[in-house]
């Protein structure tokens, strides 16, 4: 049996956050690693989705091309995945020759088979900008709750919208009211496949039940699908009037085009009737219908392609019991996480916290507690005490005659074998939480056995060998089963054991034991909490200003030179720095301005150490009204720049007298 495992294509308008990792990429990698562990033939295919309005909007906002945005975030996403140890056999992009060619072939075949037709629709057109407006180019008020809404979605009430439903619509480029014009679009005759899709979903034995149920509900009211857009960025529709394919008809075709990058072997997974293969898609639950209904419909329409065997739909991840929001920066980015903590800790926590098909929450407190009291106190404790004791007594895993083992030894080894069987079943059912809990239970059994045997009190060397052999065998099973979840930490344990990733005990010399699982410190968790809260406050302020500007059509306010000269900016030098007692973020800083010293309260704690600040030249606003922060008076402000959470104080590039005025 050959396996093809795919992950939902990451959208190249931003980097990855923990929600992406939890729903899709980590579980897919765990599943792939386990199949490899069992010596099964498996390819892991993924990539990025590079077309659609959000990318063109971001490019326009930044004054760059869509390809610039795609290149930037394709690379950033791949770096994020690499940092989580998520590996691929093929990682492609939809803005590539092989994908565009494959997508156009699919479209032509659908048309030849009678599944594509033309239809006149109504859509917004902006006279001022001389362009048709795709859904994301229009904003206004939601017709249901009157909240601020995009042309396709209301963030307030969560409803899907059509652009023409909006109240008080306006073009996001010029803020003018668009008019409705008629346009010819191309539609996919999905409604004709109702019976075929119902039969496919009903008979898909490995499809999770919640995915089946959602798909069957949608199929009941199946309607045709507008698959063209009046845009220039995308996969061109052959022989059309300059339109491109809607991303949700061309993006899933990436699973085929990216497999093609492996060579002719791609046919074994997608076409060949002579090769047994299974296709498993890992996705987030927000795109379940696209993969369980729309994508199978496309495959049915082109004919001769194999159908997905399973669509594994991961639930949503909230953050501190609130919905994640990239626009509000209420999110933990993968890059920020791995700079502080082991990616293995994230892989473990996100899988053990809840069944994959259910929504769950990421909280910094729960993360710390689960890692410290479960992973480290149970698995880490058993592994460390076993290796320390065995290395000190024997220098290697002792060799024993299996028929001399006592019943209590055999009982634990049989538990290892039984756990392996249960674990296999759970992984193949995508039940990663319960699979990890089996490892935890086995580790508890190991700890209980170690404690009951009291190896430190055993005087018979042969009996001690049997006990430590049993402990090391149990540890080998734990490492083997845990390896798909925590490839780095288990690799370090195997290195100490001088063993291979299998269930055989070779009895090689052990290396000097060291602590593999280190506890999460309170200060590190506190810093991540403070970073999250400070960023959300900043984003809320920016968002409020942007919304006001949108409503009024306002641009950035320009000021006269006289206004600027009212600000008294001077060069100073930091003399003293101490903590503000009532604050976790503030320093009390004494600055020398040449002819006087000022006391300034600044939120630089966490960005600069005390030693870094003392003696540093700084730029000071000297004519601010004094203000009290945490009960301490501040007589000015230091100037600093901030980007992506990095703070940098403004400085001067040559020696100049303290107190010098900045013009």
Swiss-Prot record:
A Pfam family assignment: Anticodon_1
Binding locations of ATP: 326
Motif ('HIGH' region): 10-20
Domain of life: Archaea
An MF annotation (GO) of this entry: methionine-tRNA ligase activity
InterPro entries: Anticodon_Met, M/V/L/I-tRNA-synth_anticd-bd, Met-tRNA-synth_bsu_C, Met-tRNA_ligase_1, Met-tRNA_synth, Methionyl/Leucyl_tRNA_Synth, MetRS_core, MetRS_Zn
Cofactor: how and how many bound: Binds 1 zinc ion per subunit.
Domain tRNA-binding: 563-663
GO cellular component: aminoacyl-tRNA synthetase multienzyme complex; cytosol
UniProt-annotated location(s): Cytoplasm
Principal localisation: cytoplasm
One annotated GO biological process: methionyl-tRNA aminoacylation
EC code(s) of this entry: 6.1.1.10
Entry cofactors: Zn(2+)
Record-linked HAMAP family: Met_tRNA_synth_type1 (MF_00098)
Subunit structure: Homodimer.
Functional summary from the UniProt entry: Is required not only for elongation of protein synthesis but also for the initiation of all mRNA translation through initiator tRNA(fMet) aminoacylation.
Annotated family: Belongs to the class-I aminoacyl-tRNA synthetase family. MetG type 1 subfamily.
Protein known as: Methionine--tRNA ligase
């Amino acid at each position: 049996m050959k396996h093809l495992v795919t992950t939902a294509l990451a959208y190249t308008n931003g980097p990855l956050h923990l929600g992406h990792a939890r729903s899709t990429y980590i579980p897919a990698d765990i599943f792939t690693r386990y199949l490899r562990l069992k010596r099964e033939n498996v390819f892991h295919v993924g990539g990025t989705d590079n077309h659609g309005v959000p990318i063109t909007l971001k490019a326009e906002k930044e004054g760059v091309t869509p390809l610039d945005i795609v290149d930037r975030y394709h690379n950033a996403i791949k770096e994020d995945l690499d940092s989580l140890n998520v590996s691929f056999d093929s990682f492609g992009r939809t803005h590539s020759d092989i994908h565009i060619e494959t997508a156009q072939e699919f479209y032509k075949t659908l048309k030849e088979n009678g599944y594509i037709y033309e239809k006149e629709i109504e859509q917004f057109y902006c006279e001022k900008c001389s362009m048709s407006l795709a859904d994301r180019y229009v904003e206004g008020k939601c017709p249901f709750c009157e909240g601020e809404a995009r042309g396709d979605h209301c963030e307030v009430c969560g409803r899907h919208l059509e652009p023409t439903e909006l109240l008080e619509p306006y073009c996001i480029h010029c803020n003018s009211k668009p008019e409705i014009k008629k346009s010819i679009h191309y539609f996919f005759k999905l409604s004709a496949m109702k019976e075929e899709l119902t039969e496919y979903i009903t008979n898909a034995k490995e499809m999770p039940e919640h995915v089946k149920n959602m798909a069957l509900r949608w199929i009941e009211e199946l309607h045709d699908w507008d698959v063209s857009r009046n845009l220039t960025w995308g996969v061109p529709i052959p022989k059309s009037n300059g339109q491109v394919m809607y991303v949700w008809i061309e993006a899933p075709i990436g699973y085929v085009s990216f497999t093609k990058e492996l060579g002719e072997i791609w046919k074994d997974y997608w076409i060949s009737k002579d090769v047994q293969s299974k296709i498993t898609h890992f996705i987030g639950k927000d795109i379940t219908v696209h993969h369980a209904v729309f994508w199978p419909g496309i495959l049915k329409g082109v004919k001769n392609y194999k159908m997905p065997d399973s669509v594994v739909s991961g639930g949503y991840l909230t953050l501190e019991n609130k919905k994640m929001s990239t626009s509000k920066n209420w999110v933990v980015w993968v890059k920020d996480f791995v700079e502080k903590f082991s990616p293995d800790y994230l892989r473990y926590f996100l899988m053990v916290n809840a069944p994959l098909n259910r929504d769950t929450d990421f909280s910094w407190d729960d993360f710390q507690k689960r890692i410290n009291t479960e992973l480290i106190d149970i698995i880490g404790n058993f592994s460390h005490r076993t290796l320390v004791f065995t290395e000190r007594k024997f220098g290697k895993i002792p060799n024993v005659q299996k028929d001399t083992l006592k019943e209590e030894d055999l009982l634990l080894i049989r538990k290892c074998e039984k756990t392996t069987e249960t674990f296999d079943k759970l992984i193949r059912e995508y039940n990663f939480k319960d699979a990890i809990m089996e490892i935890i239970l086995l580790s508890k059994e190991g700890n209980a056995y170690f404690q009951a045997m009291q190896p430190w009190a055993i005087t018979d060397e042969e009996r001690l060998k049997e006990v430590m052999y049993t402990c090391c065998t149990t540890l080998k099973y734990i490492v083997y089963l845990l390896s798909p979840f925590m490839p780095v930490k288990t690799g370090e344990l195997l290195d100490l054991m001088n063993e291979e990733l299998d269930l055989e005990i070779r009895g090689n010399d052990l290396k000097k034991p060291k602590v593999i699982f280190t506890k999460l410190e309170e200060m590190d968790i506190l810093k991540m909490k403070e970073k999250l809260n400070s960023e959300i406050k900043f984003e809320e302020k920016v968002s409020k200003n942007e919304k006001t500007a949108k409503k009024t059509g306002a641009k950035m306010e320009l000021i006269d030179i006289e206004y600027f000269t009212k600000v008294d900016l001077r060069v100073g030098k930091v003399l003293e720095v101490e903590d503000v007692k009532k604050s976790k973020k503030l320093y009390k800083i004494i600055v020398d301005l040449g002819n006087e010293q000022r006391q300034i309260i600044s939120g630089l704690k966490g960005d600069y150490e005390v030693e870094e600040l003392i003696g540093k030249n700084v730029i000071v606003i000297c004519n601010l009204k004094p203000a009290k922060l945490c009960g301490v008076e501040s007589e000015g402000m230091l100037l600093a720049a901030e980007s992506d959470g990095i703070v940098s104080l403004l400085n001067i590039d040559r020696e100049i007298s303290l107190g010098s005025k900045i013009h």
